C-alpha cells in the first residue's frame, strides 16, 4: 500500500473522530475481533431488536439510527449507560443503529490505534441468499498478512443462529461481500442480475440502487462515511437515466483504492456531484439534514488531497 494511502486511512475523518473524548477508547482491546465483540455489546440493529433480542425500541429512541458522527453515537451510548465502553450492555441500553454505524464504530476504534481502516458500502450475500443485500462493513489493513481484511462487526452469535451464517465474518470472503464498484461491474458485464442487488424487504433493487451505493462508497473512501439513506449529488433515482460511462469510471476508481488513490482523491474533491455537501437529503425522514460534522476537520481532510 502506498504510504499516502496508509497515512490517510490511519487518520480520523470528521465522522470517525471522537474529538475531545478519545479517552473513552483507552480501555478497549487492540485486535479487530475483540473490538467487534465490544461493539456488539454497545449497539443493537433496530429492525431486528424485538425479534432477535427481545427489545422493542420505544418511539422516542428511533432517531438514534440517524446519528452520523461517532462522537454523537458514543455520546448517546454513554447517556444510555455510563459504564466504560468495554462493559457489555443489555439490549435495552444499547444504542440503536444500522450496519453503517457498526462498521464506522470499528473504523473509528482502529484508526484511534493508528490502524488504517475504512468503511465500505456494498452488498452482502449472507443475509438472504441468493440475493445481495445493501450493507456496510469495515475494511482494515492487516500489517502481519499485508492485506486488507473485511470485518462485519454487526454479526454476533444471535445473527449467526437466526440466519444460519457460517462464514467467517471477521475475515469476510470477497465472494460474500461485494463493494459497490464490484457489484456494478458484475451487473454491467452480465455476471450478475441487477435485480438481485438492493434491499429486498423494502422493494428497492436494480442498477440505479447499485449506482447510489457506488457514490456512497466513493465518499467513504474519501473519509465521508455517510448513512445508507443519505442522498446527494449524482445519486440517481429509480426512474433516472443512468450515465453508464460515469459510473463505469467510478467503479474502476474504487476497485483498487490504493492503486488509484491520487486520482480517487482528486476526482472526489473536484466533483460537486460526488463530494458530500453540508446538508443531504435523508430518504427515511424525507427532509434535508445537516451532516453534523466539524468543518475544521473537513478542511484538514482536504489537505490530504494529492496535488
Residue ranges: model-predicted function:
Residues 2-15, 36-45, 51-59, 123-136, ...:
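His-Asp-centered catalytic microenvironments across diverse enzyme cores
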Residues 2-93, 105, 301-304:
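Secondary-structure boundary elements
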Residues 28, 92-99, 207, 214:
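Aromatic-acidic/polar surface patches that form glycan- and anion
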Residues 261-307:
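Charge-rich, low-complexity intrinsically disordered segments
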Residues 92-120, 138:
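Cysteine-centered nucleophilic/redox motifs
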